[in-house]
Amino acid sequence: MDMKKWNGPGRAHAVNLMFHNWPKDLDTAIDAIFDFGFSGVVTNVPVPKGGRVTRENVREFSGIVQKLKERGMPFWIYDEKGYPSGHGCHQVLARRPDLAAKGLYMRKFELFSGEKSFVYTIDGMSDKIVYAAKYVQNLSDVTEAVIDFDGGEALPFTRRRVRISLRAGEIAYVFIVKDAYEGSHCVHNCASREKYINLLEPEAVREFIRCNLEPIAEGCPEAFPLCERVFTDEPSLMTAYARWYESFNYALIPYSDKMFGEFSARKGYDLRPLLPLLFESTDERYKKLRVDFYSFIGERVAENYSGQISAWLHGQGAELSGHYLAEENIYQHVTEYGDYVRVVRSADYPGMDILYTLPTDFFWNAPKYLSMISRKKGTDGFMVEFCPFYKREIFDANAFENFMACASILYMYGARVINTYFMPRLKDYNAEVFPDFGWGLTREESLRLNAYVRRIYACLGGSRPACRTVMYYNLEDVMAKAVPHISGDYFMSSYYSQTDNSLTEYARVLLANGVNYEFADREDLVGGKVSPRAIIVPACAFVADETYEALKRYEAEGVKVYFTGRRPQTVSGRAFSDVGEVCGAAEVLARERGGQAFPENVYVTPYVNGMTAVYNNNTDKTCLCIGDRARVYDPDAGEVRELRAGEKAEMPPYRLWIFEKTADEEDPSAG
C-alpha cells in the first residue's frame, strides 16, 4: 500500500468529465474542472450539428489541445461528434453508400404433396438474392423434419428472382440481403436515425478513419500523442432488433459480400449449403455451424474495427479505448458482435458503460466481463462511461449517494477510470461561462467523490481480483442457440437467455452474500490460465468439447466443478456424467463461503495483492464482525484503522472498505 498516494492531494486517478462543447473562455473552464477535483476530460473536434470534420474545426480543436497541454489537464479524444462511432459524422455512407450495414434473411418453401412451380421475386426493401438451394425431406417421418442437407441442389437465380420447382418432400431455401437498419440500434439510439457502416467491411472502417481521424492527425499533430486514449462509442452490427415490442418481416444475420469466401478460407468448408442451420435447428450440425459462424463474425469485427483503428492509432502514438454496445448480457455479446470479448480485446484498453446507475438495480455481471478481459489483456483495469440514463428521476433524487455506490461497485470489480456524463454544477463556479450547468454534483460532493476514487485506486490500483471461484463464460452455448428473430425479444425466451438468467441468479445468491466469482472462458480453461479452487458452469445446454476435457483435468487436480440444473452436452453432441456434480446456486453458496458468513448485501472481492474489497449495498449501516486482525482503509473518511479479530465495525451504506490482513506483531499495542 502506497500511503503517499492515499494521502496525496493530487488529481491523478480522479473522475474525468465527458466534455463535448467548450466555452470560449478555456482557462476558466479548466479552472472550474480542476476546482471541483476532477482529473481531466473526454473531448472532441467541435463539429457543428449536422456538420463534419474540417480544417477549420480541427484548427479550433488544436487550440483546445494546446490549452489543455499548457494547463496540464489530461484528455481523451472522443472519436467523432456523433453517435454511434463509425459513421464519420454521416460522411462515410454519403461517400460510399455501398458500405452500409447488411443483413441476410431466409425464405423457406416446402411441399408435402403434388408439384408446384413458381418464380419468387424479392420485395422492394431488399437488395439481392445471394444463394438458393433445394433439399429433400424424409416424408416417412410424420413427426419430425428430417432434411438431407448433404444432398442439396443449388438453384440458379438472378439478382431479384429465382424459379422454384418443388415435388412432394422437397424444400427450397432462398437467402436474401437487405440493409440492416429498420428496428435496429440505427433508429433507437437517441442521436440520429441514419444508416450505419458494415463492420464486416474493412473498407468501411478505413473510410471512417479517413473522414474523422486523419484530419486530426494532419491538422493537430500533437493531439494523438498527447491524449490519454481515444474513446470509441458503441459500434455494432445492426442486425439485431432493439425493441421487444416491435416486429419486422426479416430475421437477419450479419452479412457482407466477401463473407462466404472468407468463411471458407478460415473454417475450411463452404457455409452456403448449411445456411438454413443458422436460422433453424433441423440438423444436429447446427451447434458447431453456429459456433463457427459467430466466432468468424467476431474475428472479422475485431480485425476490421477495433484492430484496424487501434493499429492506425499506434502509428500516431495513441491507444484505442471506449466501449461497445450491450455489455450486460451474453446473448447480446453474440447478436451485436459475434464475439464481444474478442472485439473488446482487440482495442488497447477495455471499457464499458453503465446506464443503470442505481445500486438497487445494477447489472452485477457486466463489470465482471470487463474484469475478465482486463486480466486477459494484462491492463491495470478498465474504463467506465458513467451515464445515468434509465430511471433518471430516481437517480437524481439522491445523485451523490447513487454515484458513490456505483463507483464503489465498479472499482471493486476492477474499473480504474470513470468518464462521466453526469456533470457537476459548474455554474456555481462561473455562471457566465457555464449557464447550462446548474444541475448535478455540488463542488463539495465532487471533491468528496474524486477523493474517494483516488484513495480506492491507491489501495487497488496495480492489482486485480483473484480468481478463486471461477464462473464459466459459456459463449459457445449462446452461439449454438443463436437464431435471428423478427423482434428484439431474445430475453423473453428462457432457452435463448438460459445462461444469462442463471448468471443473474448467481449474482443474487453468491455475490450478494459475500462469495465472489470471476469469469473465465474456454481459452482460459483449456490453456490452464486460471488456478481456481472451484469452477461453476451456469445453466446451459452445451459446452465446447475442449471445455469438457479441461473440466475433467481441473477436477482431477482437486478443483471442484459445479453444474447448474443438469449437465450439458458438448457442442459435438457428447453426453457426459463423469465430471463435476449438479447443484443449485444456494448449495454452491453454502459450500463456497465455508465458515465465514457476511451479512446479506455485503459484497466481498479478494485481490491478488492480498487486499480484500468489501462493499455494503444496504441502505443502512451494517455491522461487520472481523474474522482476522486487519488494517481497514476507509476511502470516504480518508481514515486507516486497525481492527482486532472478533472486533465489530459499523460500515456505512453504499461504501467500499479495503481490508489488509495484518499479523499480531504489527500491532504497536501487542505484547
What function would you assign to each model-found segment?
Residues 36:
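Histidine- and aromatic-enriched segments that form or immediately flank copper-ligand environments
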Residues 2, 6-28, 39-46, 52-90, ...:
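Carbohydrate-binding surfaces of carbohydrate-active enzymes
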Residues 43-159, 165-169, 173-206:
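Acidic/aromatic-lined carbohydrate-recognition and catalytic surfaces
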Residues 203-211, 215, 219-220, 299-303:
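A conserved hydrophobic secondary-structure block that centers on an alpha-helix together
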